A protein has these predicted regions:
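Beta-propeller blade repeat segments, especially FG-GAP/WD-type strand-to-loop junctions
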Residues: 1-12, 49-64, 106-111, 131-143, ...
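Repeat-solenoid scaffold signature
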Residues: 59-98, 122, 126-179, 240-277, ...
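Solenoidal tandem-repeat scaffolds enriched in leucines and small polar residues
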Residues: 1-30, 34-37, 43-45, 518-560, ...
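Beta-propeller blade termini
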Residues: 2, 25-34, 54, 76-86, ...
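Short loop/turn motifs that recur once per blade in beta-propeller domains
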Residues: 10-22, 62-75, 115-126, 143-154, ...
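Gly/Ser/Thr/Pro-enriched helix-cap/hinge segments flanking short amphipathic alpha-helices
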Residues: 141, 211-217, 221-418, 451-452, ...
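Short glycine/acidic-enriched loop and turn motifs that connect beta-strands
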Residues: 47-48, 98-101, 180-182, 266, ...
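Hydrophobic beta-strand segments that make up the repeating blades of beta-propeller
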Residues: 35, 39-44, 92-95, 173-177, ...
């Protein structure tokens, strides 16, 4: 509704671009793209994506959720916006319905399949997952860290509020949850599809659905992008069906108290007695056309640190909180300055305001500033793909590995595209080879100094899927040849997994070398050329990723010895356990014990970081170099002297805690 004359409003929904047919449950107004103009974030329930209406600066808005939020909650409920990590940026949290305990997850989590996510993409919906989403703002790109932050599962949740409850200087998080009946209980859902349900009355249905009251959840901000559940230790574990909530200093002691609205029950009022830390409360009196100073921003500075807060009372779900801004200070005894941005053009500053008070500040545009474009951190990298002529798009086939193995943690049939770089044409510039998926040609991107020229590598079999590549001089003619590793978790024909070697004529023209590799049929993950037998030619370690249709059985990693240009499988002679080392994702050579011989570092899925130590003419497993309790989902290894002390260190990439 557009305010026409201060007394009347006009419906301009359609012409403003805000027409929305979703089940919208809440909204928040803030500057999503940091251009100085307020945008609108709308939380939508069910399958429809939430919306980020970006202000076009002409009275219209355009939904561009995908450019800023790469995935979302599936059934988005309440939303709150605040700077929880004190970097000056607005962060966002949206709520969903994922239970906290393993038993309730199995009881309540709906059956999903990968085809559903394909349908989302087909209908231009963005990826959505049944969990809370916490977005940390990094210069208008929002990274979702709810699992890392430990706030992703709080059951059927409604209203989130980010505020500093213990006055330590960092905003904590309180979430209301509950629903009178467990409508998503899988037993009830299955019953509704049965014959008996046809004869049931509405009351019969209601009586069958379980009633489960749950406590709301209070999280302490640990100041490291993680939150700690303090519901019990802060004595707030009261079972309820809670929806709206509001914050206010009800007893005028300086800290924030909480009012919670409960369905068919008495409201909660939580008096805050957590700490005696210092604080500052700020009440802004705005101009005549904005008396509450809505969307004004206050920033306080102390030493090298600062906090920000914005006057935005319309937060959470079906709720409005006060307009007084609260800053916890911990044990700090002074504030250097307080800056108020009344709007995009006017600001004022107060030096050394007293603490432990309610500071009331009347509108005073003493300083004119140009904030129409918020200053952004310069980017470290600039994409130059188009300028350099890197015209390539990987075309992956649809693969549904979960149909054959529902307990797989990921799809192993789309591990590509593989990529390798080297001076293939001998002109002094690095060229690039990109491996194609099944049905797609691999390509050679030849660099001529000013850009790249694309050539299809027709010698590589398009019936196979390229998942690993390595460049090295196979035939000792002074140029780089190509080892092509194939793989696909859905191939049941061994010949589709047989790796190949392509020989380079020195100008980037490749032909397949017949009969140089022995027959072995595994999904390749890494190729390492090195001289294992000391005869001055290059042998090969070829690690294996997964065994098709036999997950999680270990595939066989092989060691191939170069004998007069033909590779012989010497795996049993050199590798422990006949090469059945696990589902390997990466490997690197490194002289671990300083004996002058190359050892092998390996890692993979459901395993740790392991050393294959060279002992005379074979390798043995030696687990004494790494901690025993580091099993996990490891992806990659990089060897480098990171601390410049003359020895080699490791960077090992894991699936991570945000998962």
């Amino acid at each position: 509704f557009k305010n026409i004359d201060g007394q009347h409003f006009k419906d301009v929904t359609q012409e403003s671009g805000l027409l929305n047919d979703a089940f919208s449950l809440s909204a928040n107004v803030f500057d999503i793209n940091q251009d100085g103009w307020d945008d609108i974030f709308v939380s939508n329930d069910f399958v429809t994506s939430s919306t980020a209406f970006i202000n076009q600066k002409d009275g219209t808005f355009k939904d561009d959720i995908g450019s800023y939020f790469k995935h979302q909650s599936f059934s988005s409920m309440g939303v709150d916006v605040a700077d929880f990590n004190n970097d000056g940026q607005d962060d966002v949290i949206t709520l969903d319905m994922l239970p906290q305990t393993a038993s309730r997850i199995k009881q309540m989590f709906p059956k999903t399949n990968f085809q559903f996510y394909d349908l989302l993409d087909l209908y231009k919906e963005k990826p959505q997952y049944m969990r809370n989403c916490l977005y940390v703002n990094t210069d208008n790109s929002f990274n979702e860290i709810s699992q890392l932050a430990n706030v992703y599962n709080t059951d059927w949740s409604w209203s989130p509020l980010l505020a500093d409850f213990d006055d330590d200087g960092y905003k904590d998080l309180y979430i209301t949850n509950g629903f009178p009946r467990d409508l998503t209980d899988l037993d009830f859902i299955n019953y509704r599809g049965s014959y008996e349900s046809i004869m049931a009355t509405n009351q019969d249905f209601l009586d069958m659905i379980p009633r489960v009251k749950l406590p709301n959840v209070m999280f302490l901000n640990s100041q490291s992008n993680q939150f700690i559940d303090q519901t019990q230790s802060w004595e707030m574990n009261y079972d309820s069906y809670s929806y709206g909530q509001a914050l206010a200093d009800l007893d005028q002691d300086g800290d924030l108290d909480i009012v919670v609205n409960n369905l068919n029950d008495t409201a909660f009022i939580f008096e805050n007695k957590l700490s005696e830390n210092n604080y500052l409360n700020v009440k802004l009196e705005g101009s005549k056309i904005n008396t509450q100073a809505l969307h004004a921003k206050v920033k306080i500075f102390y030493g090298s640190e600062f906090q920000t807060a914005k006057v935005n009372p319309y937060r959470g779900y079906l709720s409005s909180t006060g307009t007084t801004l609260h800053f916890g200070l911990g044990t700090r005894t002074a504030i250097d300055s307080l800056q108020i941005s009344w709007n995009s053009e006017e600001s004022s500053t107060i030096l050394n305001p007293s603490i432990n008070q309610l500071l009331t500040v009347a509108y005073d545009a003493s300083t004119k500033v140009n904030q129409s474009e918020t200053k952004k951190t310069p980017k470290l990298f600039t994409e130059v793909s188009d300028i350099m002529g890197l015209d390539y798009s990987h075309q992956e086939n649809k693969s549904y590995d979960f149909f054959s193995h529902e307990l797989q943690q990921r799809i192993y049939s789309n591990e590509g595209p593989a990529l390798v770089a080297g001076d293939i044409t001998g002109n002094g510039y690095e060229d690039i080879i990109i491996g194609g998926a099944e049905g797609q040609h691999s390509v050679l991107m030849t660099q001529e100094g000013s850009g790249f020229l694309k050539t299809e590598l027709t010698c590589i079999n398009t019936k196979k899927e390229v998942v690993a590549l390595a460049l090295y001089d196979v035939d000792s003619d002074g140029d780089l040849d190509l080892y092509v590793g194939y793989g696909h978790n859905g191939f049941n024909k061994p010949e589709l997994l047989q790796d190949e070697i392509a020989l380079n004529d020195g100008a980037g023209n490749f032909t397949i070398a017949e009969g140089v590799l022995p027959n072995y049929n595994e999904v390749t993950s890494r190729i390492i050329p090195f001289d294992v037998d000391g005869d001055s030619d290059l042998d090969l370690l070829v690690t294996a990723r997964v065994r098709p249709f036999n997950y999680p059985e270990s595939p066989q990693t092989v060691l191939l010895v170069n004998e007069a240009g033909v590779y012989q499988n010497k795996t049993k002679d050199y590798l422990p356990d006949d090469g059945y080392l696990g589902m390997l994702t990466d490997a690197e050579l490194m002289d671990v014990n300083g004996d002058g011989m190359s050892d092998i570092i390996i890692t993979g899925e459901w395993m740790g970081i392991e050393v294959l130590l060279r002992k005379e003419n074979s390798f043995v497993r030696d687990n004494s170099y790494f901690p025993a309790k580091i099993n996990g989902a490891w992806n990659s290894i990089t060897v480098s002297d990171l601390d410049a002390d003359g020895d080699l260190d490791l960077i090992v990439g894991n699936q991570g805690w945000n998962n």
